[in-house]
Amino acid sequence: MKDLNHIKHFYFIGVGGIGMSALARYFKAKGNFVAGYDRTSTELTRMLEDENIEVNYEDDITIIPETILNNQENTLIVYTPAVPKDHKQFEFLKKKNFEVVKRAELLGMVTDQKYCLAVAGTHGKTTTTAILGHLLKETGAKVTAFLGGISEDIQSNLIMQGDKVVVVEADEFDRSFLKLSPNLAAITSMDADHLDIYGDKSELEKSFREFAAKVPEDGKLFVKNGLPVNGSSVGINDNSDFSAQNIRIEEGSYVFDLKTPSETIKNLKFNLPGNHNLLNAITALAMAIEYGTSIHDLTRALYSFKGVKRRFSYKIKKDHLVLIDDYAHHPTEISAVHQAVREMYPNKKVLAVFQPHLFSRTRDFAEDFASSLSDFDKVFLLDIYPARELPIEGISSAWLLDKISNTNKALIQKKNLSEMIKTEEAEVVVMMGAGDIGEEVEKVKKALLHEA
């Protein structure tokens, strides 16, 4: 692999992905030529275009920018595992002997010579990474942070405030996180997921243990209390090394004390609802403290954190009507959203709208999906979002709907979604999924506010 310092041109195949777009922004900010392909135009790709990153939406070799084609010696082609094997642009550039790397490899190269803080976990890593990046940024650290979601604080998935320390989301998909060299790391959860890649939970756990082993002796690993990995423990109301104690809700925010191995910090305030988010905050605080950030500065920085888009994002927040958008696509995440909603709105009728993501995940966790969704007052299911997969015979949203014990349920087509939600008169509507349901949220919001 060439030295990254010699690369002046980058072409990202799948540039609209959350991890890819952060890298594209990073190299653009460094003064390089950056362009890319994606299958569809989204809010994120339009933002990239506004930042003078050229994006094309047709898999056609004739529209690859001339700047890329004419500068092979100092050009790098970056791709994700989601790119199909028969992608014409990708195949063409490989045959022309352009240097090609996976996104995870490039992220590994970027972080290799820097002090690296990495957050892994099947759930919680995006929010934890965003909180950690925010804490370091707000306390004056010279930090670059690659986020797996759009921070509500900066409306971006990239923080660039220097390069003394790098914060990254360490993705277990395709074992990507094994390309990283973290100095400090965290594992927020190790629930079974991505079984299409790993086969079974034991292989997934083995991969997390390999990630944990990458932390050097002079570094530190933080783990959620109870996980089968050794490290400094993080928890809520327990005997963890870092634990939230004396938790109460005041004016819609958490107020709590943080017990650390050396002291207890009183009356921290945090604005995101749900025990899962509180645990994310404790993990980020523990890592920031270990990095050497002042406790006093962290208190102020934590309170100012606004959140991550599509992570319990309020789209409407009125006394009689609440619309929440969330990326939850695993039964554990759905249950966490349910806990947060019930904690904030204990006496209100809650409608859950869920778009399953991947046929394989729907099949592998069908009973757990049915159980977690049944806890809501009413459930609307959309068709399964296939992403990288072909259909699996017998696996459908109708099949999943049959397993939901709650009788207040229905299978809904996207074109009818806004009207169906309007007729429900639910006080709280939660829209969940990792597919394109996020694109439907604005339509639903308009319909509920009678703007449609």
From Swiss-Prot:
SUPFAM superfamilies: MurCD N-terminal domain (SSF51984), MurD-like peptide ligases, catalytic domain (SSF53623), MurD-like peptide ligases, peptide-binding domain (SSF53244). Disulfide bonds: none annotated. The lineage of its organism: Bacteria, Pseudomonadati, Bacteroidota, Flavobacteriia, Flavobacteriales. ATP binds at G121, T122, H123, G124, K125, T126, T127. Pathway: Cell wall biogenesis; peptidoglycan biosynthesis. It catalyses: UDP-N-acetyl-alpha-D-muramate + L-alanine + ATP = UDP-N-acetyl-alpha-D-muramoyl-L-alanine + ADP + phosphate + H(+). Belongs to the MurCDEF family. The gene is murC. This is UDP-N-acetylmuramate--L-alanine ligase. Keywords: ATP-binding, Cell cycle, Cell division, Cell shape, Cell wall biogenesis/degradation, Cytoplasm, Ligase, Nucleotide-binding, Peptidoglycan synthesis. The keyword Transmembrane does not apply. Its EC number is 6.3.2.8. InterPro entries: Mur-like_cat_sf, Mur_ligase_C, Mur_ligase_C_dom_sf, Mur_ligase_cen, Mur_ligase_N, MurCDEF_pg_biosynth, UDP-N-AcMur_Ala_ligase_MurC. Pfam families: Mur_ligase, Mur_ligase_C, Mur_ligase_M. One of its GO terms (biological process) is cell division. Gene3D superfamilies: Mur ligase, C-terminal domain, Mur-like, catalytic domain, NAD(P)-binding Rossmann-like Domain. GO terms for cellular component: cytoplasm. One of its GO terms (molecular function) is UDP-N-acetylmuramate-L-alanine ligase activity. Cell wall formation. It is found in: Cytoplasm.
